[in-house]
A protein has these predicted regions:
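Sec-dependent bacterial lipoprotein signal peptides
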Residues: 1-14
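Membrane-proximal, proline-rich intrinsically disordered regions
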Residues: 16-76, 319-325, 331, 344-347, ...
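Short, surface-exposed recognition loops and adjoining beta-strand edges that mediate ligand/DNA contacts
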Residues: 26-32, 60-73, 77, 174-182, ...
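Extended ligand-binding clefts on enzyme/binding-domain cores
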Residues: 38-41, 45, 50-63, 255-256, ...
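Conserved, well-structured interaction surfaces
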Residues: 89-172, 215-225, 382-389, 408, ...
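Short coil/linker segments at helix-helix boundaries
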Residues: 141, 146-150, 171-208, 249-259
Length: 515
């Protein structure tokens, strides 16, 4: 039943996106009326997925959520450098360097922060409106099949809302170990009031995201599902991640939260009717090709769900598109950093073999292949890539559990999980390590495993570790000083993006981040 309704929703995706564009604080007059029918709730829920691809507030392509999510999670770390400057006409001309060098502009034309802020609030409000409408309709319907599907729809909306709240809090808030009751996250309009609200605390934001993921896990069925839609396994996986983010620095771990990270990691792999696996051997090389049926991916956004198979702009940072004859001159300018090359065993590590390739543009450099999936011929001889953006997968959940076990002092269990990921990558198991030595190995393994998936930067921040680049992006000669290429979360508040000034002018209750 779910597949049927979501396919209907996707067919009407453009109309849904337009409806969601109207469902913003300045115009909510028709929302209640529109969401009074079951079919419209189905369409509105499907439209939320479409909003990952559509521009926020009718702005340009740079405001696509999945692009901004990637840039702010990946470019601010040390796996990628710019081997060439973005062209002056490029939408990344200012936004790419703004993230990479921690310039953190509050202008929407210069930073991806506005994209995350605007799109997050649009989707959070849309999901909240849907949940309110679902609860009303559930109370008034007597059709058992419709009730069952309303429960499922509530789970999907709760998952998406939790995901957006959690991600935005990491962008605009301080890490959880730093006064979470005092430091601010984002406004939480979970009642769908569409009113200007104050920012909630980081703790309140995390607790709301947890509540949403728990609702999703309770409402979504234990069955194999299309991983490009919200599902129970992804809900458990996100709970393992968020509790890990709350689990403190390795020097001062919080036992209760780390135990919850272990609990929900276990839940991810303990469902009766859904199979979640970490891909092994030859299967590993296909990890990023088909998220719909992949047993390791828990949740991913894919442009392939759209009738037009829209090109994924994240691909453009790392590889060519267009005519194959122009592959060596195509405009992509990101390459794998020497920092990352140094931590990889390029002879033995299957992740290097399967997921990197020599750059076609820059001799002696490498690019990631994680966004080379979904290749299709848009027209004669011209190729585009409708590759997925993975938000969470089973390989991460194993490493979540390994880190949580380490912080609980259960070194044997932590080492077992760490070695599970190492051995599937073709590396030898480790033994006889514990404490900070074990933590360092887990941290580096997360970097090897999750590079180019918008995770590494937040691993540095949530663990209070200084992020340092050994190699500068020399294409930007003005930004080779250390203040542009390292950040210490324990001494610098520039880990947070600024709230866009335009949003503060619209909502006088907002308090700007201070450095």
């Amino acid at each position: 039943m779910k597949v049927k309704y979501l396919l209907i929703g996707i067919l009407f995706l453009s109309a849904c996106n337009g409806r969601l564009d109207e469902m913003r604080p300045h115009n909510m007059a028709e929302a209640d009326n529109y969401l009074s029918s079951f079919n419209n709730i189905v369409n509105a829920t499907s439209g939320l997925y479409g909003q990952f691809q559509s521009a926020a507030g009718g702005y340009t392509e740079v405001s696509l959520y999945h692009v901004a999510y990637h840039v702010l999670g990946e470019f601010r770390a040390n796996n990628v450098i710019f081997n060439d400057a973005f062209l002056s006409w490029s939408t990344d001309y200012l936004r790419g360097p703004d993230a990479h060098f921690f310039l953190n502009s509050d202008q929407k034309s210069q930073s991806y922060a506005w994209s995350v802020w605007a799109k997050s609030h649009q989707l959070i409000l849309g999901a909240s409106r849907n949940i309110v409408a679902i609860d009303k309709l559930y109370a008034n319907t007597v059709n058992p099949d419709e009730k069952l599907n309303l429960v499922r729809l509530k789970g999907e909306n709760a998952f998406l809302r939790g995901l957006l709240i959690f991600n935005a809090t990491n962008v605009f808030g301080r890490p959880f170990w730093d006064q979470p009751d005092k430091n601010l996250g984002i406004p939480l309009d979970v009642e769908a009031t569409a009113q200007a609200l104050e920012r909630s605390s980081v703790r309140e934001c995390f607790e709301q995201a947890i509540a949403d993921f728990k609702t999703a896990a309770a409402c979504l069925p234990d069955e194999r599902s299309d991983r490009t839609f919200a599902n129970k396994a992804a809900s458990f996986g996100m709970l393992s991640r968020i509790y890990l983010y709350m689990g403190g620095m390795p020097e001062s771990p919080v036992e209760d939260y780390n135990r919850m990270a272990v609990r929900y990691a276990d839940s991810t792999f303990s469902m009766k009717n859904d199979v979640v696996e970490v891909l092994q051997g030859e299967e590993l090389k296909d990890l990023y090709d088909n998220p719909k049926t992949n047993k390791e991916i828990l949740f991913a956004f894919t442009p392939a769900n759209f009738p037009s198979r829209i090109h994924n702009l994240v691909h453009n940072y790392y590889s060519w598109y267009g005519y194959e004859s122009s592959a060596s001159t195509s405009g992509y300018n990101c390459v794998i950093s020497r920092d990352y090359e140094e931590i990889m065993d390029q002879e033995k590590d299957l992740r290097w073999t399967y997921f990197t390739e020599p750059s076609g543009r820059f001799n002696g450099r490498y690019n990631t292949k994680k966004y080379n999936g979904g290749k299709y011929e848009a027209f004669s001889g011209y190729y585009s890539f409708a590759c997925p953006v993975v938000f969470i997968r089973a390989g991460e959940v194993i490493l979540n559990r390994a880190e949580a076990y380490m912080k609980l002092g259960e070194s044997g269990k932590a080492l077992a999980d760490l070695n599970y990921i190492r051995q599937r990558a073709g590396l030898s198991p480790l033994s006889g390590i514990s404490g900070m030595e074990l933590f360092d190995e887990i941290f580096d393994e997360r970097r090897r495993e999750l590079a180019f998936e918008a995770q590494t930067y937040y691993d540095y921040v949530r663990n209070g570790r200084k992020m340092e680049r050994k190699e500068d992006s020399v294409a930007y000669s003005s930004y080779t000083a250390r203040q542009y290429n390292e950040i210490d979360p324990q001494t610098s508040r520039r880990t947070m993006c600024l709230i866009p000034s335009e949003e503060i002018s619209l909502n006088k209750k907002l308090v700007q981040n201070e450095y």
